[in-house]
Swiss-Prot record:
It comes from Synechococcus sp. (strain JA-2-3B'a(2-13)) (Cyanobacteria bacterium Yellowstone B-Prime). Its cofactor is Mg(2+). Catalyzes the transfer of a dimethylallyl group onto the adenine at position 37 in tRNAs that read codons beginning with uridine, leading to the formation of N6-(dimethylallyl)adenosine (i(6)A). It holds the Pfam family IPPT. It comes from the Bacteria. InterPro entries: Dimethylallyltransferase (IPR039657), IPT (IPR018022), P-loop_NTPase (IPR027417). The gene is miaA. ATP binds at residues 28-35. Belongs to the IPP transferase family. GO terms for molecular function: ATP binding; tRNA dimethylallyltransferase activity. Its EC number is 2.5.1.75. This is tRNA dimethylallyltransferase.
Length: 354
């Protein structure tokens, strides 16, 4: 079955809508402009735009999470943003359920949804169909774990579930606590409880990247812009409303500003510290996407599974014609058959010409 293009826009027959239009994922490390490119593509395709950033699901955490601004959200509906209060622990299983339901709804309407974000586990929960442990939050256990220093919690996670710890930043208190909850509740590492059930619809994963020196410059510019927009005031307000021990306030950027407000970091050191730690986080994201999503350097990579195909490739986030590069890949992917007889090895290197 091939998808026809009408004026460059895919048109699926009603009988095919449960198998096609599939899913487009725009992923990559922080500060690569994923949200902007996803917005442009969503407007061009008429697609639902779904957030896959684990902090943007929370209300009130706006500036420090690089959440699309109200003006940007007014240009096109952004979904799975601002859906829970900061005091609620939103699990990967909850995200997966919400995302899968919205994707299924989009497919019934003949639409190709776009999933955008940098939280690898959120993305993998959808693209690989991970079986996420259904472990509800444990308030009493969490209160006990929150009394431990963050570095002790993370070190303990490294002992109990080293695989999960590899993919969690040492300063990510939310995910560290969640992984420990699962270990203590089930007696097994969270990483050992996940079983993949890949979806049968086609998936296109577009990873945005640039060399680390340029990415660090982008991180520095964005951090300065966040400060100018009132990030410190945002943190002050959140600390007054929820208290300084809120787990989300221990995450990247918010924790450093909290330390500054408490007099533990000089003002002159605050912004460089956030930039340095964000760069470290971006390197971990790159490692994760290369290893877990199969996005390889410099070429397209295809894997075939059942009725569906997952294709992933990197694009330079600073390319002047990036929107057109993305559009070229989307059109080629949509025009390709949804079933093929060749092996993954045979498919590699010839699915696209990036």
């Amino acid at each position: 079955m091939r998808i026809t293009l009408e004026n460059g826009i895919p048109a699926a027959a009603a009988s095919d809508r449960t198998e096609w239009p599939g899913l487009i994922v725009i992923a990559g490390p922080t500060a690569t402009g994923k949200s902007r490119q996803a917005l442009l593509l969503a407007q061009r395709l008429g697609s639902p735009l779904l957030n896959a950033d684990s902090r943007q699901v929370y209300r009130e955490f706006d500036i420090g999470t690089a959440k699309p601004t109200p003006a940007e959200q007014a240009l096109w509906p952004h979904e799975l943003i601002d859906i829970v209060d900061p005091c609620h622990t939103y699990t990967v299983a909850e995200f997966q359920q919400a995302a899968q339901a919205r994707i299924a709804e989009a497919h019934r309407q003949g639409q190709t949804p776009i999933l955008v974000g940098g939280t690898g586990l959120y993305i993998q929960s959808v693209t690989a169909g991970l079986g996420i442990p259904a472990v509800p939050p444990q308030p009493q256990l969490r209160r006990q774990l929150e009394t431990w220093p963050p570095e002790i919690r993370y070190a303990w996670l490294q002992q109990l579930d080293p695989v999960a710890a590899q993919h969690i930043h040492p300063h990510d208190a939310v995910r560290t606590l969640r992984a420990l909850e699962i270990v203590y509740t089930t007696g097994k590492p969270a990483s050992s409880l996940r079983r993949a059930h890949p979806p049968h619809y086609p998936i296109l994963i577009l990873g945005l990247r640039c060399p680390m020196p340029r990415l660090e410059q982008r991180i520095a510019r964005r951090t300065a812009e966040m400060m100018e927009r009132g990030w410190i005031e945002e943190v002050k307000t959140l600390r007054e409303r929820y208290g300084p021990d809120l787990p989300l306030l221990q995450t990247l950027g918010y924790a450093e500003i909290g330390a500054y407000l408490e007099g533990r970091i000089p003002e002159a050191e605050l912004q460089p510290l956030i930039v340095r730690r964000t760069r470290q986080f971006a390197k971990r994201q790159m490692t994760w996407f290369r290893a877990m999503l199969g996005i390889q350097k410099g070429h397209a990579y295809g894997t075939l599974s059942g009725r569906g195909r997952c294709v992933a490739l990197w694009l330079d986030c600073e390319a002047e014609d990036l929107p057109e590069q993305i559009w070229k890949q989307v059109k080629a992917w949509m025009a390709a058959p949804t079933t093929v007889e060749t092996s993954p090895a045979a498919a590699e290197h010839r699915l696209f010409d990036p």
